[in-house]
Amino acid sequence: MTRQATPRTRLTREQSRDQTRECLLDAARSLFMTKGFVGASVEDIAQEAGYTRGAFYSNFDSKAELLVELLRRDHEAMEVDLRAIFEANASREVMEARVMTFYSRLPQDNKMFLLWVEAKLLAARDARFRTRFNAFMKEKRERLAAYIEEFSARVGTPLPIAPDLMALGLMGLCDGVQFLATADPQHVTPPVVEAVLGRFFARVVYGRDA
């Protein structure tokens, strides 16, 4: 007896659009990581995803808009890991250790660092992109500051500086150390990066050595 093929479910217009958008984002992420933001054209992205240039512009106003969406998703993925630490019913000591480990390992876990660097360079040169990117970065700092404030309340450790300033400082330190590690991996090795970030974090946030 011949088995009848299961009819393929037809996607709605919204589902088809979402699928196209996801394919374009996946293709762009892959190309940006290999060719860089500047080196990958809209045509390259559309071709890699299996769509037309028109399909690209039906989903994104520009390559820069797509870049911000990729960075937003990267940040949201990081937040999921951070949120998991806060939702665990752990003691103060365990929570402090987990947060410090999370921060000190951020550079090793951030596979899209060079895209963040390219976005910052683009923001420095392109006023229109700068407005959009800086609004996103402001939101990112505010969310991190909220986590810092919540962490301080949860473990009962008073903050030495305002949460927004600490968020800015911790982000700047992490980015700077990762930049050095990317440029000179022979000397700024993962253990060195982890030690630097961990010790600075412990001293600034906890007021003690790691």
Annotate each predicted stretch with a short phrase:
Residues 1-19, 209-210:
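N-terminal intrinsically disordered/low-complexity leader segments
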Residues 16-28, 45, 70-74, 78, ...:
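Generic hydrophobic, amphipathic alpha-helix propensity
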Residues 23, 27-65, 69:
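Helix-turn-helix
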Residues 23, 27-34, 81-85, 115, ...:
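Solvent-exposed, amphipathic alpha-helical segments
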Residues 69, 80-112, 163-170:
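Hydrophobic alpha-helical connector segments
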Residues 76, 80, 84, 108-114, ...:
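Amphipathic alpha-helical packing segments from all-alpha helical-bundle domains
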Residues 94-95, 108-131, 179-182:
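Amphipathic alpha-helical segments used for helix-helix packing
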Residues 130-134, 151-210:
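Hydrophobic/aromatic-rich alpha-helical bundle segments in the mid-to-C-terminal region
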